[in-house]
Amino acid sequence: MQEGKISQIIGPVVDVDFPEGQLPSILDALTVTRQDGSKLVLETQQHLGEERVRTIAMEGTDGLVRGMSAVNTGKPIQVPVGGEVLGRMLNVVGDPIDGKGPVPAKKTYSIHRAAPKFDELSTKTEMFETGIKVIDLLEPYSRGGKTGLFGGAGVGKTVLIMELINNIAKQQSGYSVFAGVGERTREGNDLWHEMMESGVIDKTALVFGQMNEPPGARARVALTGLSIAEYFREEEGRDVLLFIDNIFRFTQAGSEVSALLGRMPSAVGYQPTLSTEMGELQDRITSTKKGSVTSVQAIYVPADDLTDPAPATAFTHLDATTVLSRQIAELGIYPAVDPLDSTSRILDPNIVGDDHYNTAQAVKQILQRYKDLQDIIAILGMDELSDEDKLVVARARKVQRFLSQPFFVAEAFTGLAGKYVKLEDTIKGFKEIIDGRHDNLPEAAFYLVGTIEEAVAKAKTL
């Protein structure tokens, strides 16, 4: 074990001197034992010459002094993987933070791993059914694909993520990995308790590096979650869901340490290695012939500017986008997905079939027409519309309400049992509304129901 001495500490960046010929490799983990016996992990970032390396700390550097010993572990940060991490909450270096004692994992993985080779990748494009009508119909997720979840505060990003975890765990007995990157600790705490209550915790591993952590932890915790997910894909051949909340903070953490590492900033002060870092992370999220990692990434958009380098770099990797809208949340329609703003690469008749594609396009057309007519309605009222337009508005309002759905994880708020709607039922329901087969039903019948049969049954009780 090579041992070095700390020579300089600048916030989260620590320089360590090693004896000649014993330099650690780039990305190797070093451990420092503090006075109280706790261990601090440093990750090697640069060789500065003269037997000195520059490292980033994964925890606060309080209490470190020059001359302290740093031991080279000889390999990158290793985290526990396998069935033992399910139902547990870990930090960036794989230590448990749930107070339930050590994780008895038989195997560890490095957080830095090569992306799968070309010949290992699966080329078939498959739709991934979520049981959420608006997603399955208008912006279908692909298995092994990447989805961006764009939304401001309080429009339901976390509830949507919770519902996805719940549906995957119950319907497809799949595993989920949740990586909390630089978000509020309170939200992580809420998520943990909600998962315990809803019973999905046994099929989920949680990894957190929240806002209060130093940038080293926030820049690496997404990789920790990804390694745990990769184990289930490679060694157990599973289809895993990886949730990252929030991918913007991963970039933000990288930009915080970039200047301290002495790199010249690039556009808007971001790190010059922005697209490389994002690419290394995103390239590992993929389907192989063994299994798949499907990711849903919450993306914060600074100052609502989608051309900002951070969200713009993430955009290039996405297969589908789900945009949550405050205007729709204000109407009381949950999930508050904007049906006209959300997109998917696989909404293509060759992949999802003509029936699905045509129904989705018809839904978008009728909603767009309603949107165009809203100004006229606001100024002149409904009476000034032609009979044809009145019919369009009536059907569009039914479609809009039918896009809402009671969630399993929101039963406490809605008082309604959650619904998982199969794709064929979703397509059938919207097709019937658009064809005018339910023009005689009141629009309230379509609000917060699952299938079209439930809407018809609800209409009889109104």
Curated annotation (Swiss-Prot):
It comes from the Bacteria. PROSITE patterns: ATPASE_ALPHA_BETA. Its main location: membrane. ATP binds at residues 151-158. Its EC number is 7.1.2.2. It catalyses: ATP + H2O + 4 H(+)(in) = ADP + phosphate + 5 H(+)(out). It is found in: Cell inner membrane. One of its GO terms (cellular component) is proton-transporting ATP synthase complex. Keywords: ATP synthesis, ATP-binding, Cell inner membrane, Cell membrane, CF(1), Hydrogen ion transport, Ion transport, Membrane, Nucleotide-binding, Translocase, Transport. It is a peripheral membrane protein. InterPro entries: AAA+_ATPase (IPR003593), ATP-synt_VA_C (IPR055190), ATP_synth_F1_bsu (IPR005722), ATPase_a/bsu_AS (IPR020003), ATPase_alpha/beta_chains (IPR050053), ATPase_F1/V1/A1_a/bsu_N (IPR004100), ATPase_F1/V1/A1_a/bsu_N_sf (IPR036121), ATPase_F1/V1/A1_a/bsu_nucl-bd (IPR000194). Pfam families: ATP-synt_ab (PF00006), ATP-synt_ab_N (PF02874), ATP-synt_VA_C (PF22919). One of its GO terms (molecular function) is proton-transporting ATP synthase activity, rotational mechanism. Produces ATP from ADP in the presence of a proton gradient across the membrane. The catalytic sites are hosted primarily by the beta subunits. NCBIfam families: atpD. F-type ATPases have 2 components, CF(1) - the catalytic core - and CF(0) - the membrane proton channel. CF(1) has five subunits: alpha(3), beta(3), gamma(1), delta(1), epsilon(1). CF(0) has three main subunits: a(1), b(2) and c(9-12). The alpha and beta chains form an alternating ring which encloses part of the gamma chain. CF(1) is attached to CF(0) by a central stalk formed by the gamma and epsilon chains, while a peripheral stalk is formed by the delta and b chains. Belongs to the ATPase alpha/beta chains family. This is ATP synthase subunit beta 2. The gene is atpD2.
